[in-house]
Amino acid sequence: MYWRSDEWQEEIYPACEQLSLPEGLLISQNTSFGSQFISRSIFQQKCYKHSVPMLNTNNGLMLNKFAGLLPIAEQTWHDFTGNSSKGSFAYSVVPVLYSISISAVITWFLNIFVITNYTIKPSILLRASTTLSSIYLLITVIMAIIELHKQQKQGFLHGTKLFDCINSSLALNIIDLIVVFLLQINQVQIIMRIFSRQKDKRLTFFVGIFASITSQVLWAITRFHSFSDDSEAGDILPAFQYLVRIAMGVCYAALVSVFVLMKINYIIANKKIWLITLLTVILIYGPVAFFIADVSNAWVFELSEIFSVVTYDICVVIPWEWCNKYNSIMKAKEKEGVLGRKFYEDELYELDRFELFVDEEDEDHENNNNENDDESGNENDNERGNNDHNNRHGLSRNGENTHKGYRPVNFDGNDKGFGSIFETYRRTKETFLNITDHVIAKGLAIPRSASVFTGTPVSAHNDEVFRMDNLNHKRDDPADMTLENQEDHRNTNRNNTIRFASNSDIHRTNNSTAQNRRDVFVYSTREVIIDASDTET
């Protein structure tokens, strides 16, 4: 970042410069190198980037009993640890190693929790992202141990050198790029779960994917591209990328918080989700708090990528489990109620696209009226049919008014070119929405309502008709009826008709939507009246 550089800009400490030593006895820990008496020598202590002293681990018997540190080296170490922020305890090896280990343990625990969740199977994306984050932290721990082992063999330990080893690893940077992108998509997945309308889910999907790709592309440019010292892009892009991540974290936390506040009455009524709701509200602000700490604290910046993965992992797994708990409570509530779940106007129009609300008797009247040359009879029948249709399909017409774009448009013979263009546009749009719904339903495991459909409508003229004779408690034997009663009985059966989509149409519907979802639509063409005696009513 342009406001904070990870490079050491401090002056060279005196102990890190070349020191002229007087005559004396030179003793080496190497057994092949014998002790020698020298009259003059030049000594240079091992320092980080030849400017900052490091912790000496050669505390043997010779150093403790017979010889001590050089006075200038001892004074330099005292100044470095007492007056420099880089020499504080936070930058030593122990806090760094503990921070990495704790982050790895948290990530592994969340991964095990997701994989072993037997109540509601998590999505493939969630399992993949948590598994990759665990692998990322595992590789980080292994690299840290190897680097500390190398430093120990050289006789020095330094936390900042460990920072450089982790941050400069190409393999870790590539894995971090993939893991953070998947975790950001998981956040989009959780936001989609709190919306009920399919249109809102699609909009969230497109906006979230675009924001995630933009954020990670900017991060990749700032991480893998080397900017010159006088390049303005090297100062602007890191700051802008950081602002994008902060904005995404704030939007995610705000949307989840608003949804929790809207459903606070249901949450208060169910004590089982109090704890996980509190954890969700607190932990979703983890990335925001981390970004603030990252800007204000240079030590957090050194481990920013590791902490970023952990905070993303936490604010994804916990809200996902909260959504599972909340959805199970709402499903139980809907089962206890009479009305079930809510239907929206776009869903009502989706149902009407199948022409399942069209009455067969009205269709017969319409066909007969077209063939009849009597204008007065046609006007009366059409007026009666239109009144019946308006009474039964008021709701579906409201959906039609709000979704006129789905209705087929008829063009004249001179406008065949426009008709083909419009038909191509319609089919392309349906295919695109169908693919999007498949990705949402399968890849992101977002359940959708059974009435949402993006394929070609099924024609009502190809439907099979079944008589629901068993709906009436009292059925007279047709053999015992007169001709007039039998005719009334047939008319009653015609009115009590349930229409099902044919097997081929259901198969096409299943292929165009989700394979694991049963798309069975049952609607009555007329109001079904169950015969009952006066005493029973």
Swiss-Prot record:
Which keywords are on file for this protein? Cell membrane, Membrane, Transmembrane, Transmembrane helix
- Read off the InterPro entries from this record: PalH
Q: Where is this region: Disordered?
A: 362-410, 472-495
Q: Which residues lie on this side of the membrane: Cytoplasmic?
A: 116-127, 186-203, 269-272, 319-537
Keyword check for Ligase: no
* Record Pfam families: PalH
GO cellular-component terms in the record? plasma membrane
Instruction: Specify the superkingdom.
Output: Eukaryota
State the coiled-coil residue ranges: none
Topological domains, Extracellular:
1-94, 149-164, 225-247, 294-297
Intracellular or extracellular location(s): Cell membrane
Identify its protein family: Belongs to the palH/RIM21 family.
Q: Which PANTHER family does the entry mention?
A: PH-RESPONSE REGULATOR PROTEIN PALH/RIM21, PH-RESPONSE REGULATOR PROTEIN PALH_RIM21
Q: What is this protein called?
A: pH-response regulator protein palH/RIM21
The source organism is Debaryomyces hansenii (strain ATCC 36239 / CBS 767 / BCRC 21394 / JCM 1990 / NBRC 0083 / IGC 2968)
